[in-house]
Amino acid sequence: MRTLRLIGMAVIAVIMSVNFTACSDDEEEDNRPLSEKIIGHWVLTYKEGYIKDPDYPEDDEAWSHAPKDEYEYFGNFTFREDGTYSEYELDGTSNPQSIEKWTIKDNIITLIEDEHEQYELKVLEITSDKLVLEFYYKHENDGETYAKMTYKRG
């Protein structure tokens, strides 16, 4: 009886040690700065958001879906190391709409289209193959625009 209990405890110890070694952290933490992680081509996979106008509430709209052949705000991106980016249509065309500049500070990507037009996108999440960006804009008439975009590395 004592031998069976000893064998049983040994079997449990072996199972527990195998269990602990099998549960190691598969995804290592990426300590690179955001300005390095963002480099590459990102394909829009999901978008959600809304537009609210207190002057014309009947025109308010909201969306939450996979991208179609057009987009409400931002499409596919390619961010380059030299501080430039291109935005691409969702219809699969490979020609960028233009080549513009970008900067990053405190998890905020600033897209600079020209000296008068800039957009700030907050980075909510970034991994080796996933990027989640958030856009919020408060209009002068107290209206607001919000968009949350999920991308995969392309």
Features from the language model and the residues they span:
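Outer/extracellular conduits and scaffolds centered on Gram-negative outer-membrane beta-barrels
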Residues: 9-15
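Bacterial N-terminal signal peptides that target proteins for export
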Residues: 1-9
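C-terminal motif of bacterial Sec signal peptides marking the signal peptidase cleavage site
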Residues: 18-22
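Lipid interaction determinants
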Residues: 24-99, 103-154
